[in-house]
Amino acid sequence: MRYFIQLAYNGTAYHGWQYQPNASSVQETLNKALSVLLNTTINIMGAGRTDTGVHASQMYAHFDSEKKLETTSLVHKLNSYLPKDIAIFDIFPVSNEAHSRFDATKRTYEYHINTLKNPFLEGLSWYYHQDLDVALMNEAAKLLLNHTDFQCFSKVNTDVNTFDCTIFDAVWRKENNRLIFTISANRFLRNMVRSIVGTLVNVGLHKITLDDFENIIKSKNREKAGFSVPAHGLYLTEINYEYLK
């Protein structure tokens, strides 16, 4: 039987979601916990691959079990067994053909910036105190929706078949002393959101114009785009599936 698992994690202590041979990952931590509790080897497949230090307030993964599971009890056992920076919200059966990664229709990320130094946001938001033209940054963000090839924002030498992504929404909002960028797409490239945010910050600083921003996208050249903002401000916040509406 196949099961979906819904979880969240603080990514500070992990070298991303995906298994790393010489470093701690969220996937490996979950595999070990499930394998111990179910007394069999479990290999979970995540809906995405967050990078080192990136957080997730919603992540889905799937795994297979030869026997029917008592899911409510398993959720409690996992939360007791796992470290405090990983929380399990739900485990539920799905069809054997369901796939947490390939069936996802939309993914949403948020990037958090705090403009006032706050020790309680350390490691959870990027502290950046320079004044930013948020209205202009939102104009630039809208331009993303006019394009599909985002090679300029992708990590160099990444192993992908295509740089095409369909962006559904991209917007900045102010909340007290915080700026939050929300972006939704059918898929994302490695380092894509962080390099988009860094380039939009350059727009907000008036270092580049709206035309410059659009020309960067058209260039397909990572060197022309802005810096990658720190990972600790990035959150995977929502994953959508047609059959989980």
Model-derived regions: residue spans:
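Structured-RNA-binding interfaces characteristic of tRNA pseudouridine synthases
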Residues: 1-245
